[in-house]
């Protein structure tokens, strides 16, 4: 039995029979015939469409269709297209024009007689084609028609004519609507259906209607998933036999259809036809909506669906709808995971053959599609089409939401997701949803850890082939894209997209578009949460994570989760420590190629990004963007907690950690935690000590390149960041930012413990440690702990004596750059920071900040032990050591311990004698900057600190504070024992010792104990005789620098401190202050024994020794003891006979400066101290004090032996010697002894005959001043 044919299942009607059928019966006939044909198609029997089916599909009557017209095979075949040519019966046949429906270009000479047909010529071009059909037809139906010299057999002449039309290419049939021509009536009919939208065949499943039943059948297979046609080679199944036929060509590799223009071959004629359009550029199919033209009608149909918004093809798995059935089939492969098309080169598999074809170009490198405008070649026509739009600027696809235009529909589709927020692709592992399937596929690899693309060099696996390709370049250094102009090869190659604004070029047009937004400021992507806009959708996507806090990317090693896959990938390298990207200059390796590229700019100095505002250039575009915000003042990122705004989102994120207190990054070395991984990375360098960035000027090395760049500005003096308020310039932007707070006064960082607010987060962090007392950084040398690593590093220099910072002016070196900066201000005299209250200027902002406290009086730092408050934390820290007795800083020379390093530094100068601070006015040198600063005021006479009560001005704030207490009589420090109040805590501390009698400071030499360490130190010098401070004028040595300074004033005669009351001048401000108390009459220090009051506590202490009889200071020469060290010093001169104080008037020399001062008054007759009772004047205040007793008759000093009272302690002391018989002062000439040194002095004159006191009136000379004074009264008439 032969094969089943369409004729076996077809029914024929004559005209009479057809007219007997009603409309329903005629429709039934049509449906049955079409259904029978579809079944044959489904079984693979019908290889082509009979004319009957064509007419029935077109709705035409078939009553005169004859039997031979219902067969599905012709005796004649054109092997060029493997298309049978159907014979027809009569020349008058109404269907004579409907014969050859698909192809137009076979010549008659290409026809041949199929097997069993003896009277038909063979087609001489394609001899192999006829064997592909199995069906046969009897030769009795043949009839020969001659055409020229060819014997081509047709059933009708019309068939021959129609076949000839195909070879000639003539198109006689024209569409009046679109002015398009066709060679066949069937083609014209098909064309008409496109714009009339005849859709007779409806799908019951999806409701969609089609023009042709075959299309409906194909569509239904999308719903059922039915694929009855299977490939024997690879097992892949297809829904249509024709698709299987096309598919088979893949395995054979046969490409019989060649393009005459470029020589490229194809395995299907349809593909060749499409290809030819590239050369002709013909686009006859135009869209009525937007005017866009297409080369294929199918593309036009697909395009129209864009305007209609129609998406009839729905996926049962996820519900997503598509406008084309082919897209739905491709989509289904996502769910099935099916990838039957494998690349023989690299083994990669694909879901579609077209994708495999595109992929193969990667291996061949072929680029057949060339742009006529710029000559650029591409691998695929779609890329060329996309490229051409760059030149035309065409963007036909408009977004209805925002009006934005796009060059491709696919880009529009992706863009629309932004507005809808639709994320149909969901991850089954973690539930995360994506806008596009490609994103989901990439995401899945996170969970699977799949890395199918292996590097043959190092074995490393990658999740994407593109990443593997990039990776390979590391090993081979391959640069496949070579420029014909300059022979230079690069990895990325050509950058044809140039910005007209700034000239920057890009590889891709998308990059250029994004770049242009920098100039236009366009930010089309808006965040619905906070309203912030972004220039790219990807940045918006990343931004959204800030609001959701979602972290779907988890590290399998340590469990840490991240917001973005890129961050996870970067994090994973921490565990692997892989750094494949190496710098050829310095050998440093990096885990990302982008970081290597940025790193290389350190060596090249390249800064391609320029700021148009100030001309400053940057190595990174991100840095330029951040910099621009400085000019714009834009701070779009706001903190919801405190309202503070920031220029960068990263800064906001860092800021948020302040409120949250979150510190997830922990250091394995020391356990310290950090809020950011980058800070942890920087911290780790402390433990490794690695410093790869070296300064070529001074050789100093740094941990980070940014620090090196900042350091270089020290040498260059570059200060690119300028303050608009005051014009001051800074070397770094961060310092400028901090500086600006000075002008605004803003303090956004608040302490939750005590409520104190700060300008900077760093200050708050430092402040918090006061409450926690946390000190994680410990010194290995001495065990001292610190709350900041920076302080520990500075502290270590004490032990190493490292001083890397050198002053170019004077050569002095410093351990800290801040100290060097402060020191430089001495040479420059620069004081840019001015106090608004009093106008005083300072060289550092920190000093100005400290100074301001004087005006506010604020004391936020309180001691928990005693309740005392301080203005600065450093003072509190220093104070605390009083309670602990801690003295960690030891002097290597003498072993003495100090509570602060600064005090140790000052102390060390005693041993070295170094005096680096020199006064330009008088040439005087000083060991310390503070003393030097005070000295300068001597010349300038500047007094910035003014008392509001009396208008008096002072040079230092401490003196003003002390002075103010005179007006307020403020004595806040009360002692509970006696109720007495004191103006300062230090005086209270000293006072307490009186009640406790405590003397903790003991001399190891003689066992004597003292109340204060300073007294013990003074005392020790008695035993050691240490006098390290020597006078260059007279070689006299002193135990203390203050004594030497006082002594020098003797030689210089310098007395810059003058009393405004009486005009008296003093060498020292302390002496002037003491003197002023004389005028004020202020005597706050009262003796509890006798009620006597004193100006100074030291005077009271000396006075008390009268009552106690204490004389701690002993003369080693004669054994005599004294109540004060100063009296002992004076006494020692008796034994040495030294008289360093010489009178310039008469040449007389004295042992003490006080005696010289008293002597000088003889020449001037100056008596500034007047008695208010009698008006008498005196040369010294002490004499006035003694004189006053005459008027009061007061006798405070009583002898315990006999009860006799005296006005002065000296008289009492003299009196006591009557009872004791003590006469310690012996005359070396005659051996006579005296009870007082003054009597001995007077006695000595007998032996010398010296008479220094001469009367100017009569010329008489006297040995003693008292006798001389009495003699003067003879001439004046004054009563003796």
UniProtKB/Swiss-Prot annotation:
Keywords: DNA-binding, Metal-binding, Nucleus, Repeat, Transcription, Transcription regulation, Zinc, Zinc-finger. Ubiquitous. PROSITE patterns: KRAB (PS50805), ZINC_FINGER_C2H2_1 (PS00028), ZINC_FINGER_C2H2_2 (PS50157). A zinc finger (C2H2-type) spans 173-195, 201-223, 229-251, 257-279, 285-307, 313-335, 341-363, 369-391, 397-419, 425-447, 453-475, 497-519, 525-547, 553-575, 581-603, 609-631, 637-659, 665-687, 693-715, 721-743, 749-771, 777-799, 805-827, 833-855, 861-883, 889-911, 917-939, 945-967, 973-995, 1001-1023, 1029-1051, 1057-1079, 1085-1107, 1113-1135, 1141-1163, 1169-1191, 1197-1219, 1225-1247, 1253-1275. The keyword Disulfide bond does not apply. It is found in: Nucleus. It holds the Pfam family zf-C2H2_6. The keyword Transcription regulation applies. GO terms for cellular component: nucleus. GO terms for biological process: regulation of transcription by RNA polymerase II. Residues 4-75 form the KRAB domain. One of its GO terms (molecular function) is zinc ion binding. InterPro entries: KRAB, KRAB_dom_sf, Zinc_finger, Znf_C2H2_sf, Znf_C2H2_type. May be involved in transcriptional regulation. Belongs to the krueppel C2H2-type zinc-finger protein family. This is Zinc finger protein 208. The lineage of its organism: Eukaryota, Metazoa, Chordata, Craniata, Vertebrata. The gene is ZNF208.
């Amino acid at each position: 039995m032969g094969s089943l044919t369409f004729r076996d299942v077809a029914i024929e009607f004559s005209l009479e029979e057809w007219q007997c059928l009603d409309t329903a019966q005629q429709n039934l006939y049509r449906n049955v015939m079409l259904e029978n044909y579809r079944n044959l198609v489904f079984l693979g029997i019908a290889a082509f469409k009979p004319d009957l089916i064509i007419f029935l599909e077109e709705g035409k009557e078939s009553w005169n269709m004859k039997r031979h017209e219902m067969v599905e095979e012709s005796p004649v075949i054109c092997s060029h297209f493997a298309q049978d040519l159907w014979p027809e019966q009569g020349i008058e046949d109404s269907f004579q024009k409907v014969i050859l429906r698909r192809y137009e270009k076979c010549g008659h000479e290409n026809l041949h007689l199929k097997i069993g047909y003896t009277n038909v010529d063979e087609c001489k071009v394609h001899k192999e084609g006829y064997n592909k059909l199995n069906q046969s037809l009897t030769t009795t139906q043949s009839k020969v028609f001659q055409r020229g010299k060819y014997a081509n057999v047709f059933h009708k002449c019309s068939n021959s004519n129609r076949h000839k039309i195909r070879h000639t290419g003539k198109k006689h049939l024209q569409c009046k609507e679109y002015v398009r021509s066709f060679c066949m009536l069937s083609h014209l009919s098909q064309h008409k259906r496109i714009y009339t939208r005849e859709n007779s065949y409806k799908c019951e499943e999806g409701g969609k209607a089609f023009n042709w039943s075959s299309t409906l059948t194909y569509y239904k297979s999308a719903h059922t998933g039915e694929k009855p046609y299977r490939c024997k080679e690879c097992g892949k199944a297809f829904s249509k036999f024709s698709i299987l036929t096309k598919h088979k060509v893949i395995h054979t590799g046969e490409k019989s259809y060649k393009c005459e223009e470029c020589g490229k071959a194809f395995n299907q004629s349809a593909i060749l036809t499409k290809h030819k359009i590239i050369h002709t550029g013909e686009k006859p199919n135009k869209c009525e909506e937007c005017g866009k033209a297409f080369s294929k009608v199918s593309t036009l149909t697909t395009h129209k669906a864009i305007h209609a918004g129609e998406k009839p093809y729905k996926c049962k798995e996820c519900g997503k709808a598509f406008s084309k059935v082919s897209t739905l089939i491709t989509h289904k492969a996502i769910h099935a995971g099916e990838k039957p098309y494998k690349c023989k080169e690299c083994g990669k598999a694909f879901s579609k053959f077209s994708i495999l074809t595109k992929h193969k170009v990667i291996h061949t490198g072929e680029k057949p599609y060339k742009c006529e405008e710029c000559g650029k070649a591409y691998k695929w026509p779609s890329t060329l089409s996309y490229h051409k739009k760059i030149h035309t600027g065409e963007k036909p696809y408009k977004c209805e939401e925002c009006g934005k235009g796009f060059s491709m529909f696919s880009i529009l589709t992706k863009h629309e997701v932004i507005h809808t927020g639709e994320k149909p692709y969901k991850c089954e592992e973690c539930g995360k949803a994506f806008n596009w399937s490609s994103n989901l596929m990439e995401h899945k690899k996170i969970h699977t850890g799949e890395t199918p693309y292996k590097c043959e060099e190092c074995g490393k696996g990658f999740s994407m082939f593109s990443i593997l390709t990039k990776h390979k370049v590391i090993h081979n250094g391959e640069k496949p894209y070579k420029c014909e102009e300059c022979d230079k090869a690069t990895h990325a190659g050509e950058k044809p997209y140039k910005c007209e604004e700034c000239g920057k070029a890009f590889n891709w047009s998308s990059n250029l578009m994004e770049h242009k937004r920098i100039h236009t400021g366009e930010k089309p992507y808006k965040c619905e949460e906070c309203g912030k806009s972004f220039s790219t959708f990807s940045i918006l996507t990343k931004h959204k994570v800030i609001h959701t806090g979602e972290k779907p990317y988890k590290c399998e090693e340590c469990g840490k989760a991240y917001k973005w896959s890129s961050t996870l990938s970067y994090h994973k390298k921490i565990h692997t420590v892989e750094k494949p990207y190496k710098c050829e200059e310095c050998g440093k390796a990096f885990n990302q190629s982008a970081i290597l590229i940025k790193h290389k700019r350190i060596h090249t100095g390249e800064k391609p990004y320029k700021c148009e505002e100030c001309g400053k250039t940057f190595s990174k575009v991100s840095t330029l963007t951040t910099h621009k915000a400085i000019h714009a003042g834009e701070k779009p990122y706001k903190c919801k907690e405190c309202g503070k705004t920031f220029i960068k989102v990263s800064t906001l994120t860092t800021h948020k950690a302040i409120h949250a207190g979150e510190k997830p990054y922990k250091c394995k070395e020391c356990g310290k935690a950090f809020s950011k991984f980058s800070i942890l990375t920087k911290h780790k360098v402390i433990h490794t000590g690695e410093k790869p960035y070296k300064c070529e000027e001074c050789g100093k090395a740094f941990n980070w390149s940014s620090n090196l760049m900042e350091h270089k500005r020290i040498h260059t003096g570059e200060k690119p960041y300028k303050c608009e308020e005051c014009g001051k310039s800074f070397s770094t932007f961060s310092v400028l930012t901090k500086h600006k707070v000075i002008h605004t006064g803003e303090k956004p960082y608040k302490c939750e413990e005590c409520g104190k607010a700060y300008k900077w987060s760093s200050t708050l962090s430092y402040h918090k440690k006061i409450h926690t007392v946390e000190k994680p950084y410990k010194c290995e040398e001495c065990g001292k702990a610190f709350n900041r690593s920076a302080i520990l590093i500075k502290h270590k220099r004490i032990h190493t004596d490292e001083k890397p910072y050198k002053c170019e002016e004077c050569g002095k070196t410093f351990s800290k750059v801040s100290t060097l900066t402060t020191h430089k201000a001495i040479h420059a005299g620069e004081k840019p920071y001015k106090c608004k209250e009093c106008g005083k200027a300072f060289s550092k902002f920190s000093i100005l900040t400290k100074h301001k406290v004087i005006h506010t009086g604020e004391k936020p730092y309180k001691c928990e032990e005693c309740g005392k408050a301080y203005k600065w934390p450093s003072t509190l820290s220093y104070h605390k050591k009083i309670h602990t007795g801690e003295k960690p800083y030891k002097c290597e020379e003498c072993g003495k311990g100090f509570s602060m390093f600064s005090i140790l530094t000052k102390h060390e100068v005693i041993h070295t004698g170094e005096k680096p601070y020199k006064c330009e006015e008088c040439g005087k040198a000083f060991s310390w900057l503070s003393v030097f600063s005070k000295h300068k005021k001597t010349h300038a006479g500047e007094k910035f600190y003014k008392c509001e009560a009396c208008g008096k001005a002072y040079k230092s704030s401490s003196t003003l504070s002390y002075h103010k207490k005179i007006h307020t009589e403020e004595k806040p420090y009360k002692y509970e024992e006696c109720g007495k109040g004191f103006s300062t805590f230090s005086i209270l501390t000293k006072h307490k010792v009186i009640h406790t009698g405590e003397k903790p400071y003991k001399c190891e030499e003689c066992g004597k104990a003292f109340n204060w360490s300073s007294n013990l130190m003074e005392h020790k010098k008695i035993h050691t005789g240490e006098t390290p401070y020597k006078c260059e004028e007279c070689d006299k040595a002193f135990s203390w620098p203050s004594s030497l300074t006082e002594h020098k004033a003797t030689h210089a005669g310098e007395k810059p401190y003058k009393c405004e009351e009486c005009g008296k001048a003093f060498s020292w401000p302390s002496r002037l202050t003491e003197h002023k108390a004389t005028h004020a009459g202020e005597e706050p220090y009262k003796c509890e024994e006798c009620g006597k009051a004193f100006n100074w506590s030291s005077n009271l202490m000396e006075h008390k020794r009268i009552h106690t009889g204490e004389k701690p200071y002993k003369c080693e020469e004669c054994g005599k003891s004294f109540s004060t060290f100063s009296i002992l010093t004076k006494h020692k001169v008796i034994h040495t006979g030294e008289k360093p104080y010489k009178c310039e008037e008469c040449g007389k020399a004295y042992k003490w400066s006080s005696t010289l001062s008293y002597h000088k008054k003889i020449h001037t007759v100056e008596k500034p101290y007047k008695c208010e009772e009698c008006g008498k004047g005196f040369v010294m205040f002490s004499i006035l004090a003694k004189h006053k007793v005459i008027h009061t008759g007061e006798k405070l000093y009583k002898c315990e032996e006999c009860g006799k009272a005296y006005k002065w302690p000296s008289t009492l002391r003299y009196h006591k010697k009557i009872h004791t018989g003590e006469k310690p002062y012996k005359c070396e000439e005659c051996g006579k002894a005296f009870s007082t040194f003054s009597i001995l002095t007077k006695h000595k004159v007998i032996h010398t005959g010296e008479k220094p006191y001469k009367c100017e009136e009569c010329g008489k000379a006297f040995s003693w001043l008292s006798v001389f004074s009495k003699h003067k009264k003879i001439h004046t008439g004054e009563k003796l």
